[in-house]
């Protein structure tokens, strides 16, 4: 063998070997950190100075390239932990922590999913009167009662989030006016305004949010981890199903052309930013 050629190649080989080892070590670190939510929490508890959104996104992005299933399951676990275990929609708001995760000028009503105008996408069903519809629901409290998820691939996953709520029908003048207009449209099954007077206005409701693979060809990919915008946008179809224990409301949800729209609604072309939930779980 030509010794000069050997001497020439050896430094290059060593450089490539070193570079490859560094990349492997980086990938290994990312995979270990995001292998589970608890692993990520332990890592950032020990490296608090590294807990910024850009770093978290880059770690998850690197982890996704080597173990997509573990990465997505870790993201889903953060989503569940923040909504169900940390109860951000039920407890008094930790303003500092919430702002760090969800951004400035954001509140509980901006959380998706939630029982709110934005969280229920009411503007897409009741254009022009979505605020009044939210007031008709008169949400007094809401609670995440179930959160299940499974992931096999970008074309085979499912997330189901269940909410229980307590509300008061017609909790203001605007909502009362809207109820009157709905009832005047007919097909009410003999339901009248008197059926919602005083204590009869109280009701319990259930909302179930089901996220499934998009039918428009979009897929969750490496590019969805965006450290520049500080987002991890997860594309999915969404179905929202509603039910209530209130007999008269149930009749309206079956018969009234306006009220029954809320019973079951499907949305396509949606993307859901999972980073705020994951980041909140790490804080």
Swiss-Prot record:
Annotated signal peptide:
1-25
Per UniProt, which keywords does this protein have? Answer: Cell membrane, Lipoprotein, Membrane, Palmitate, Signal
Q: Give the matching Pfam families.
A: Lipoprotein_3
**Major localization class:** membrane
Q: How does it sit in the membrane?
A: Lipid-anchor
The answer to whether keyword Zinc applies is no
The answer to whether the entry has keyword Signal is yes
- What subcellular compartments does it reside in? Cell membrane
Q: Where is the lipid attached (N-palmitoyl cysteine)?
A: 26
List, alphabetically, the InterPro entries matched.
Answer: Lipoprotein_3 (IPR001595)
> What protein name applies here?
Uncharacterized lipoprotein MG439 homolog 3
- Species source reads Mycoplasma pneumoniae (strain ATCC 29342 / M129 / Subtype 1) (Mycoplasmoides pneumoniae)
